[in-house]
């Protein structure tokens, strides 16, 4: 979307607005933000275009140059107005000061470990699952691991935090809000795990936050769930941006898409010299043969004899369509007759492709992920490699608990690039 600068200058004269500085003040953005809006190198946020049009007392379409970008008149809150398609290479970014992170729903530590790799320091990590909490303690004894209910922590935050926090992070579950959109505040979110996350954000007021979730959040409950979240973040005083990031683009041998929401505190946005941008995709995308070399031995869930005989017939890169028809029918049951979504059944991954999204169980029928050569699921350490955990990162609990922790984790390398994009942004203020 490009703005019609000539039209804007004319409208400024009509409203007796003499300078860009005055215009920026009326829109309640910084002068640099306004300059970015006018630059052909940046995509202006639709919400800022709407605010600009409101100040100039015109329709947004009167100041948009490209006809294909014209906005619907009197449009309601639209989650896509906050989708940011601006990226920057952060491969070589280094911090110029220390930034600390308070993480919620930490799980096995994929997000926290990735942020640490980006140069950020974990002040505290909240995790109620005993095995995941123990995983964090084993690997990072110096982290303040808080094994407690997130709602209790949100209500008694002063008991757990005694210093200023730079970044709040976490991946709360995707849940429907009972009154989504009616009040557009905390009350909409009571009874969900987003509520304590937003309450912690409200109390800490960090410079920035990272909220990570499944891709399905974008259209969950017809988009209402995401829109309520964005409204809450905005009311708390944050500029918000989101996008879908595919882990395969960020040194992870796995096609795993997640929505990442970034919030920047408004006072920083007004002072910024350059805006936040998401990390640019890396040129090389790893495949299984890149990450599954010399993997340490570890436990693995075994197939049943019947399933093993079926999976022996599937070639690398293949699935149920490569099976003899009668065997496929017997194996798939009712799924044979249902339409679509069956390519994950009896799936054997090839060495020359990334893994499909790992789940919390390595041998579920609908989301099979069979080893390329051996007729078995991926082992614990193979699972961890695919999620870009280092070999020295230990997982607590039984085999099932370990698979669950790894399958639920944010891939470490994806988290690293997200962290680097925030470090790049925050570095400008030092």
UniProtKB/Swiss-Prot annotation:
InterPro entries: C5-Methyltransferase, C5_DNA_meth_AS, C5_MeTfrase, C5_meth_CS, Cro/C1-type_HTH, Lambda_DNA-bd_dom_sf, SAM-dependent_MTases_sf. It comes from the Bacteria. One of its GO terms (biological process) is negative regulation of gene expression via chromosomal CpG island methylation. Residues 99-429 form the SAM-dependent MTase C5-type domain. It catalyses: a 2'-deoxycytidine in DNA + S-adenosyl-L-methionine = a 5-methyl-2'-deoxycytidine in DNA + S-adenosyl-L-homocysteine + H(+). It is an enzyme of class 2 (transferase). GO terms for molecular function: DNA (cytosine-5-)-methyltransferase activity; DNA binding. Pfam families: DNA_methylase, HTH_3. Keywords: DNA-binding, Methyltransferase, Restriction system, S-adenosyl-L-methionine, Transcription, Transcription regulation, Transferase. The active site is at 174. Residues 9-63 form the HTH cro/C1-type domain. Its EC number is 2.1.1.37. Belongs to the class I-like SAM-binding methyltransferase superfamily. C5-methyltransferase family. NCBIfam families: dcm. This is Type II methyltransferase M.Sau96I. It comes from Staphylococcus aureus. The lineage of its organism: Bacteria, Bacillati, Bacillota, Bacilli, Bacillales.
